[in-house]
Amino acid sequence: MLADKLKPFLTRFDELNTLLSDVNISNDISKMTALSKEQKNLEPIVEKAKEYLKTLDDIEENKLLLSDPELGELAKEELKNLELLKPNLEEELKILLLPKDPNDDKNIFLEIRAGTGGDEASLFVGDLVKAYIRYAENRDYKYEIVSSSEGSVGGFKEIIILIKGNGAYSRLKYEGGTHRVQRVPETESQGRVHTSAITVAIMPEVDDVEIQINPNDLKIDVMRSSGHGGQSVNTTDSAVRITHIPTGIVVVNQDGKSQHKNKESAMKVLKARLFEMQEQERLAKESEARKSQVGSGDRSERIRTYNFPQNRISDHRINLTLYRLDAILEGGLFDEIVEPLIAYYQAEALKQENL
């Protein structure tokens, strides 16, 4: 019974309130921080649980009043409303009770790379960057370009953007994979549609506790920054290239104004890539039944097609097709895709958890 599953959460919430008011604990900053975070995470479940349990009590109370000559009709009407409310609250609670992705509240590194298609792929990376930035602005997320390499005719060969905001990972984690674009290039005189592809990786920003790197495993090179076309744009050796020797992962950063800033940014990206690698290995070891049905976020998985002649955007994981490509890209309206993906994932997770 759902009500029984809620009791441990209510009990723990009361325990946390008691602990947080304890003078001895209030002097321990790290303990206070951990308990406050746990309390905050429980609040949505507890609030909804209290509303649900009150609804159950109200239903029973109104059932007793049905035979009352004066209050019977009023109780009947109230009971009707409560019976409609009950299943809605149950569905909301089931979703709240799903195991939480520990990365959901984290900031992300959004990495986009041009794949097949040459200049057209680079141009589309530029278009997608603008769309993601608009999406970030729509949700009041902060963002900064960590590193970039411009395409020869515009756009980017590759770019990494740090997006900061509560729930950034939870909203954008489904973007990882191969995105295919179909459109007529401006240089195409015959009007033929060209197909190109880009890859997107979503990596949660991690701290030193989550990923520890042995300094002896790193090869750090400094060099002069190069701009569009490869020309030097800096007379000092401010660009930094970090190679993680055990994995062969290489991170280059030259967008910052100082060597220190570039090294700091490159280390953050390296940690995120190593964390992503660990997550992919972990997912690969899990049984198929536990994997998300919407995909693993693997860069090689083709997840979406953008067809400009048809103004169509299709997400292949959930067979979603929208004929609003221009509006979605220009307005950064990715929630029109994100929301159905989240709903699908939650439905699959509910089946797996037997809720």
Swiss-Prot record:
Q: Where in the cell is it found?
A: Cytoplasm
Q: Which UniProt keywords are present, listed alphabetically?
A: Cytoplasm, Methylation, Protein biosynthesis
Source species: Campylobacter lari (strain RM2100 / D67 / ATCC BAA-1060)
Q: What segment(s) does the record annotate as region Disordered?
A: 283-303
Q: Which residues carry this modification: N5-methylglutamine?
A: 231
Recorded hits in InterPro entries, A to Z, give: PCRF, Pep_chain_release_fac_I, Pep_chain_release_fac_I_sf, Prokaryotic/Mito_RF, RF-1
Pfam families on file: PCRF, RF-1
Name under which the protein is recorded: Peptide chain release factor 1
Q: Which domain of life is it from?
A: Bacteria
Task: Quote the cellular component terms of the Gene Ontology held in the record.
Answer: cytoplasm
Would you identify the family this protein belongs to, as annotated? Belongs to the prokaryotic/mitochondrial release factor family.
According to its UniProt record, how is this protein modified after translation? Methylated by PrmC. Methylation increases the termination efficiency of RF1.
Function recorded in the entry: Peptide chain release factor 1 directs the termination of translation in response to the peptide chain termination codons UAG and UAA.
Name the SUPFAM superfamilies on file. Release factor (SSF75620)
Q: Reply yes or no: does the keyword Membrane apply.
A: no
GO molecular-function annotation terms? translation release factor activity, codon specific
